[in-house]
Amino acid sequence: LLESDLLYEQGYSVRINTPVDPLFYYFDYDQRSHDINMEFQHFHDFYEIHILMDSRATHIIDGNVCALQQYDIVLLRPYRMHKTQYPEGPPFKRLIINFAMPKDIPGLENAYKSMFLSFWEEIPIYRLPKELRKAVFDPLNAIFTLSHS
């Protein structure tokens, strides 16, 4: 485990269902390096949360180049073009959370829309102060811990 605000184990993952299912999530604790940077922007038909756990990287969203710092949170809605670029040097740790939720749950239509507003920002990158970051990371750490039980 890496000493940090967010629990981490290299190569660990948690998966419930698959991307074609209406309810799906996948936590991918891994690392990437400059040597395996993606050549092109890409998209998927599910949501993605990217949390950089190391010092720096660059995220390109719809052609906009954005510098990332440790613990920045990138929120990507489905079909949004993006890619991450990592600088030369040792691999960089990150957590990727991919997920999909059913959109047709009766009574939750308005809640669903408001829950995902942050994913629709022009630059959906969030740099939270430590107190707020803890509120976001605590549930992620609980999932990590419970999945090891």
Task: Spell out what each predicted region is.
Residues 1-30, 81-148:
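A hydrophobic/aromatic-rich effector-binding and dimerization subdomain
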Residues 1-69, 73, 88:
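Generic protein-terminus/edge-of-domain signal
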Residues 56-58, 74, 78-84, 104:
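Histidine-centered metal-chelating micro-motifs
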